[in-house]
Amino acid sequence: MMADSTRNAFGAYSITEIITTRNQNNFNANTKNQNQNTSNTQSSGGITRKPVMNDGLYALFDQLLKGVTFEESIYRGYDYSHLPNLETVFNTASDYVNGQYKIGFSEAQLDGYTLNKTFSVIMPEFSFSLEFIKNEEQSDRNPDENEQLKPKTRRIVVELVSLFNRDEIEYTPEQVRGEIALIALFKLYITGFLYHLNVNKSVYDQQLNLEKYRPLLVAIVGFESIDVKLKKLTPLYYTLATFSNYPLNILRYSLKTIVEVTNEMDQIIKRDGLFKQIDIKPMLGNTMSVGYSLRGIDNSSLFLAPKHYRQVRSRDDSNVREIISYDLSKIDFGF
Protein backbone atom coordinates (compact mmCIF):
# COMPACT_ATOMS: atom_id res chain seq x y z
CA MET A 1 0.00 0.00 0.00
CA MET A 2 1.39 3.39 -0.96
CA ALA A 3 1.62 5.98 1.77
CA ASP A 4 -0.85 8.83 1.56
CA SER A 5 0.14 12.49 1.60
CA THR A 6 -0.18 12.81 5.37
CA ARG A 7 2.60 10.31 6.03
CA ASN A 8 6.34 10.90 5.95
CA ALA A 9 9.26 8.95 4.62
CA PHE A 10 11.82 8.04 7.29
CA GLY A 11 14.41 10.83 7.47
CA ALA A 12 12.60 13.22 5.12
CA TYR A 13 12.31 16.89 6.00
CA SER A 14 10.37 19.86 4.67
CA ILE A 15 10.53 23.62 4.75
CA THR A 16 7.55 25.75 5.71
CA GLU A 17 7.56 29.43 4.84
CA ILE A 18 6.07 31.55 7.61
CA ILE A 19 4.69 34.84 6.27
CA THR A 20 3.90 37.64 8.72
CA THR A 21 2.58 41.14 8.11
CA ARG A 22 3.02 44.19 10.29
CA ASN A 23 -0.70 44.82 10.63
CA GLN A 24 -1.51 41.28 11.78
CA ASN A 25 -1.21 39.82 15.26
CA ASN A 26 -1.41 36.32 13.80
CA PHE A 27 0.53 34.79 10.95
CA ASN A 28 -0.10 32.78 7.80
CA ALA A 29 1.93 29.64 7.19
CA ASN A 30 2.38 28.54 3.59
CA THR A 31 4.37 25.48 2.59
CA LYS A 32 6.20 26.27 -0.60
CA ASN A 33 7.45 23.84 -3.22
CA GLN A 34 11.12 23.20 -2.46
CA ASN A 35 12.20 24.13 -6.00
CA GLN A 36 10.02 27.24 -6.22
CA ASN A 37 11.89 30.51 -6.61
CA THR A 38 10.86 32.01 -3.28
CA SER A 39 12.77 34.94 -1.81
CA ASN A 40 14.94 34.50 1.28
CA THR A 41 13.93 35.75 4.71
CA GLN A 42 13.33 39.44 4.27
CA SER A 43 11.01 42.28 5.20
CA SER A 44 9.45 44.11 2.28
CA GLY A 45 6.29 46.19 2.18
CA GLY A 46 5.33 45.08 5.66
CA ILE A 47 5.68 41.38 4.79
CA THR A 48 8.33 39.17 6.40
CA ARG A 49 9.15 35.68 5.14
CA LYS A 50 10.90 33.20 7.39
CA PRO A 51 11.73 29.53 6.73
CA VAL A 52 11.02 26.85 9.33
CA MET A 53 12.58 23.44 8.82
CA ASN A 54 10.62 20.42 10.02
CA ASP A 55 13.28 17.77 10.54
CA GLY A 56 10.72 15.19 11.66
CA LEU A 57 12.58 14.46 14.90
CA TYR A 58 9.67 15.37 17.15
CA ALA A 59 7.55 12.79 15.34
CA LEU A 60 10.33 10.19 15.61
CA PHE A 61 10.73 10.71 19.36
CA ASP A 62 6.97 10.64 19.85
CA GLN A 63 6.69 7.31 18.02
CA LEU A 64 9.54 5.77 20.01
CA LEU A 65 8.21 6.90 23.38
CA LYS A 66 4.83 5.43 22.52
CA GLY A 67 6.48 2.14 21.54
CA VAL A 68 4.66 1.78 18.23
CA THR A 69 5.75 -0.88 15.75
CA PHE A 70 6.92 0.05 12.28
CA GLU A 71 3.64 -1.15 10.78
CA GLU A 72 1.76 1.13 13.16
CA SER A 73 4.11 4.06 12.57
CA ILE A 74 3.78 7.06 10.29
CA TYR A 75 6.70 5.75 8.19
CA ARG A 76 5.14 2.67 6.61
CA GLY A 77 4.41 2.48 2.89
CA TYR A 78 7.61 3.86 1.39
CA ASP A 79 10.48 2.22 -0.48
CA TYR A 80 13.32 1.76 2.00
CA SER A 81 15.74 -0.23 -0.11
CA HIS A 82 18.42 2.32 0.86
CA LEU A 83 17.86 1.67 4.60
CA PRO A 84 18.68 -1.97 5.41
CA ASN A 85 16.70 -3.73 8.17
CA LEU A 86 14.80 -0.53 8.99
CA GLU A 87 11.66 -2.29 10.22
CA THR A 88 13.55 -4.69 12.51
CA VAL A 89 15.79 -1.94 13.88
CA PHE A 90 12.84 0.40 14.42
CA ASN A 91 10.79 -2.22 16.28
CA THR A 92 13.66 -3.14 18.60
CA ALA A 93 14.55 0.50 19.31
CA SER A 94 10.91 1.48 19.83
CA ASP A 95 10.37 -1.34 22.31
CA TYR A 96 13.54 -0.33 24.17
CA VAL A 97 12.72 3.39 24.40
CA ASN A 98 9.14 2.72 25.46
CA GLY A 99 10.34 0.24 28.08
CA GLN A 100 12.80 2.72 29.58
CA TYR A 101 10.11 5.41 29.54
CA LYS A 102 7.67 3.16 31.39
CA ILE A 103 10.31 2.37 34.03
CA GLY A 104 10.94 6.07 34.64
CA PHE A 105 7.21 6.82 34.73
CA SER A 106 6.56 4.03 37.24
CA GLU A 107 9.49 4.87 39.51
CA ALA A 108 8.43 8.53 39.64
CA GLN A 109 4.81 7.52 40.37
CA LEU A 110 3.39 9.85 37.76
CA ASP A 111 -0.16 8.56 37.72
CA GLY A 112 -2.41 11.61 37.50
CA TYR A 113 0.11 13.50 35.34
CA THR A 114 0.16 14.10 31.58
CA LEU A 115 3.29 14.29 29.45
CA ASN A 116 4.01 17.77 28.12
CA LYS A 117 4.68 17.28 24.44
CA THR A 118 7.94 19.20 24.37
CA PHE A 119 10.88 16.82 24.35
CA SER A 120 14.30 17.93 25.60
CA VAL A 121 17.34 15.84 24.71
CA ILE A 122 20.49 15.85 26.84
CA MET A 123 23.89 15.17 25.26
CA PRO A 124 26.26 13.42 24.93
CA GLU A 125 24.53 10.47 26.57
CA PHE A 126 21.24 10.50 24.70
CA SER A 127 18.57 11.08 27.35
CA PHE A 128 15.07 12.52 27.25
CA SER A 129 14.22 15.15 29.84
CA LEU A 130 10.43 15.01 30.04
CA GLU A 131 8.05 17.32 31.86
CA PHE A 132 4.71 16.11 33.23
CA ILE A 133 1.78 18.35 34.16
CA LYS A 134 -0.67 17.50 36.92
CA ASN A 135 -4.21 16.73 35.79
CA GLU A 136 -6.16 19.50 37.51
CA GLU A 137 -9.54 17.95 36.75
CA GLN A 138 -8.57 14.84 38.69
CA SER A 139 -7.40 16.99 41.63
CA ASP A 140 -10.73 18.81 41.68
CA ARG A 141 -12.59 15.52 41.83
CA ASN A 142 -10.29 14.17 44.54
CA PRO A 143 -10.06 16.61 47.48
CA ASP A 144 -7.55 14.36 49.28
CA GLU A 145 -4.96 16.54 51.07
CA ASN A 146 -1.99 14.52 49.82
CA GLU A 147 -3.28 14.88 46.27
CA GLN A 148 -3.54 18.65 46.70
CA LEU A 149 0.08 18.83 47.91
CA LYS A 150 1.49 17.20 44.78
CA PRO A 151 3.51 19.61 42.61
CA LYS A 152 1.88 20.91 39.44
CA THR A 153 4.82 19.82 37.31
CA ARG A 154 7.28 16.94 37.54
CA ARG A 155 10.28 16.06 35.42
CA ILE A 156 12.05 12.77 34.75
CA VAL A 157 15.14 11.84 32.76
CA VAL A 158 14.95 8.75 30.56
CA GLU A 159 18.52 7.57 29.96
CA LEU A 160 18.91 5.67 26.71
CA VAL A 161 22.58 5.66 25.66
CA SER A 162 25.31 5.30 28.29
CA LEU A 163 28.82 6.43 27.36
CA PHE A 164 30.52 6.78 30.75
CA ASN A 165 31.15 4.33 33.60
CA ARG A 166 29.56 1.49 31.68
CA ASP A 167 31.38 -1.08 33.80
CA GLU A 168 29.30 0.09 36.77
CA ILE A 169 25.98 -0.61 35.02
CA GLU A 170 24.30 -3.99 35.08
CA TYR A 171 22.83 -4.46 31.63
CA THR A 172 20.25 -7.03 30.64
CA PRO A 173 20.62 -8.60 27.17
CA GLU A 174 17.46 -6.73 26.13
CA GLN A 175 18.95 -3.40 27.17
CA VAL A 176 22.18 -4.07 25.28
CA ARG A 177 20.27 -5.03 22.16
CA GLY A 178 17.95 -2.04 22.55
CA GLU A 179 20.81 0.42 22.92
CA ILE A 180 22.54 -0.98 19.83
CA ALA A 181 19.26 -0.80 17.90
CA LEU A 182 18.69 2.83 18.90
CA ILE A 183 22.14 3.85 17.63
CA ALA A 184 21.49 1.90 14.42
CA LEU A 185 18.15 3.69 14.04
CA PHE A 186 19.85 7.06 14.46
CA LYS A 187 22.30 6.10 11.69
CA LEU A 188 19.39 5.13 9.48
CA TYR A 189 17.59 8.40 10.19
CA ILE A 190 20.66 10.48 9.34
CA THR A 191 21.11 8.40 6.19
CA GLY A 192 17.47 9.01 5.28
CA PHE A 193 18.02 12.74 5.78
CA LEU A 194 21.09 12.71 3.53
CA TYR A 195 19.20 10.68 0.96
CA HIS A 196 16.58 13.43 0.74
CA LEU A 197 19.01 16.34 0.99
CA ASN A 198 19.82 16.53 -2.71
CA VAL A 199 16.22 16.60 -3.94
CA ASN A 200 15.11 19.18 -1.36
CA LYS A 201 17.17 22.04 -2.76
CA SER A 202 15.71 25.35 -1.65
CA VAL A 203 16.58 29.03 -1.78
CA TYR A 204 16.41 28.87 2.02
CA ASP A 205 19.28 26.37 2.27
CA GLN A 206 21.76 29.07 3.24
CA GLN A 207 19.65 29.87 6.32
CA LEU A 208 18.92 26.33 7.54
CA ASN A 209 21.29 23.91 9.23
CA LEU A 210 21.41 20.49 10.85
CA GLU A 211 21.72 21.73 14.44
CA LYS A 212 18.67 19.76 15.66
CA TYR A 213 20.22 16.54 14.32
CA ARG A 214 23.25 16.96 16.58
CA PRO A 215 22.00 14.78 19.51
CA LEU A 216 21.66 11.81 17.13
CA LEU A 217 25.09 12.41 15.64
CA VAL A 218 26.77 12.89 19.02
CA ALA A 219 25.19 9.69 20.34
CA ILE A 220 26.42 7.83 17.25
CA VAL A 221 30.04 8.99 17.47
CA GLY A 222 30.03 8.63 21.25
CA PHE A 223 28.88 5.03 20.96
CA GLU A 224 31.42 4.36 18.22
CA SER A 225 34.18 5.78 20.43
CA ILE A 226 33.56 3.06 23.05
CA ASP A 227 33.15 0.25 20.52
CA VAL A 228 36.35 -1.77 20.77
CA LYS A 229 35.63 -3.39 17.39
CA LEU A 230 35.94 -0.06 15.57
CA LYS A 231 39.42 1.17 14.75
CA LYS A 232 38.27 4.72 13.96
CA LEU A 233 35.12 6.82 14.06
CA THR A 234 33.01 6.83 10.91
CA PRO A 235 34.16 10.06 9.22
CA LEU A 236 30.69 10.95 7.92
CA TYR A 237 29.03 11.03 11.35
CA TYR A 238 32.00 12.61 13.11
CA THR A 239 32.23 15.39 10.53
CA LEU A 240 28.51 16.10 10.71
CA ALA A 241 28.54 16.02 14.52
CA THR A 242 31.23 18.69 14.67
CA PHE A 243 29.74 21.02 12.06
CA SER A 244 28.81 24.24 13.83
CA ASN A 245 25.71 25.79 12.24
CA TYR A 246 26.79 24.87 8.73
CA PRO A 247 23.93 25.77 6.36
CA LEU A 248 22.47 23.05 4.16
CA ASN A 249 23.98 24.39 0.94
CA ILE A 250 27.51 24.16 2.39
CA LEU A 251 26.69 20.80 3.96
CA ARG A 252 25.58 19.44 0.58
CA TYR A 253 28.85 20.57 -0.98
CA SER A 254 30.99 19.34 1.95
CA LEU A 255 29.63 15.80 1.67
CA LYS A 256 31.65 15.42 -1.51
CA THR A 257 34.95 15.98 0.29
CA ILE A 258 34.64 14.13 3.62
CA VAL A 259 37.95 12.51 4.49
CA GLU A 260 39.04 9.86 6.98
CA VAL A 261 39.81 10.82 10.57
CA THR A 262 43.55 11.49 10.67
CA ASN A 263 45.84 9.26 12.71
CA GLU A 264 46.85 12.28 14.79
CA MET A 265 43.22 13.10 15.62
CA ASP A 266 42.50 9.45 16.32
CA GLN A 267 45.38 9.33 18.84
CA ILE A 268 44.13 12.51 20.54
CA ILE A 269 40.66 11.00 20.93
CA LYS A 270 42.05 7.75 22.31
CA ARG A 271 44.32 9.61 24.74
CA ASP A 272 42.09 12.46 25.88
CA GLY A 273 38.63 11.18 25.04
CA LEU A 274 35.93 12.40 22.68
CA PHE A 275 34.16 14.47 25.34
CA LYS A 276 35.37 16.93 27.94
CA GLN A 277 33.50 17.45 31.19
CA ILE A 278 32.75 21.07 32.08
CA ASP A 279 31.71 22.36 35.49
CA ILE A 280 28.98 24.95 35.01
CA LYS A 281 28.93 27.71 37.61
CA PRO A 282 25.69 28.00 39.58
CA MET A 283 23.26 30.86 39.03
CA LEU A 284 20.94 32.33 41.65
CA GLY A 285 21.98 29.86 44.31
CA ASN A 286 21.64 26.71 42.21
CA THR A 287 24.12 23.91 42.75
CA MET A 288 27.08 23.33 40.45
CA SER A 289 26.09 21.35 37.37
CA VAL A 290 28.05 19.36 34.81
CA GLY A 291 28.07 19.81 31.05
CA TYR A 292 30.09 18.37 28.20
CA SER A 293 31.83 19.55 25.08
CA LEU A 294 32.62 17.50 21.98
CA ARG A 295 36.16 17.36 20.62
CA GLY A 296 35.85 18.59 17.05
CA ILE A 297 37.42 16.99 14.03
CA ASP A 298 40.03 19.79 14.04
CA ASN A 299 40.53 19.45 17.83
CA SER A 300 38.18 22.35 18.46
CA SER A 301 35.63 22.28 21.30
CA LEU A 302 31.84 22.34 20.84
CA PHE A 303 29.62 22.77 23.91
CA LEU A 304 26.70 20.33 23.95
CA ALA A 305 23.66 22.23 25.18
CA PRO A 306 20.30 20.41 25.44
CA LYS A 307 18.04 20.55 22.39
CA HIS A 308 14.28 21.05 22.55
CA TYR A 309 11.74 19.61 20.13
CA ARG A 310 8.15 20.70 19.57
CA GLN A 311 5.52 19.64 17.11
CA VAL A 312 5.58 21.47 13.78
CA ARG A 313 2.28 22.26 12.12
CA SER A 314 2.85 20.78 8.68
CA ARG A 315 5.27 18.61 6.78
CA ASP A 316 5.45 17.68 3.10
CA ASP A 317 6.52 14.44 1.51
CA SER A 318 9.65 14.37 -0.63
CA ASN A 319 9.76 12.69 -4.01
CA VAL A 320 13.23 11.16 -3.94
CA ARG A 321 14.79 10.85 -7.38
CA GLU A 322 18.44 11.52 -6.62
CA ILE A 323 21.04 10.56 -4.06
CA ILE A 324 23.97 12.57 -2.74
CA SER A 325 27.44 11.72 -3.95
CA TYR A 326 28.61 10.23 -0.63
CA ASP A 327 28.59 6.43 -0.94
CA LEU A 328 26.00 5.39 1.64
CA SER A 329 26.84 1.72 1.08
CA LYS A 330 30.00 2.30 3.15
CA ILE A 331 27.97 2.79 6.31
CA ASP A 332 27.98 0.06 8.93
CA PHE A 333 24.69 0.39 10.78
CA GLY A 334 25.86 -2.02 13.48
CA PHE A 335 22.69 -4.06 13.69
UniProtKB/Swiss-Prot annotation:
Compositionally biased intervals (Low complexity)? 27-42
The record's Pfam families line, in alphabetical order, gives:
Reo_P9 (PF06043)
What are the start and end residues of every segment in region (Disordered)? 27-48
Record organism? Fiji disease virus (isolate Sugarcane) (FDV)
Q: What is the lineage of its organism?
A: Viruses, Riboviria, Orthornavirae, Duplornaviricota, Resentoviricetes
Classify the source by domain of life: Viruses
For this entry, the protein name equals Non-structural protein P9-1
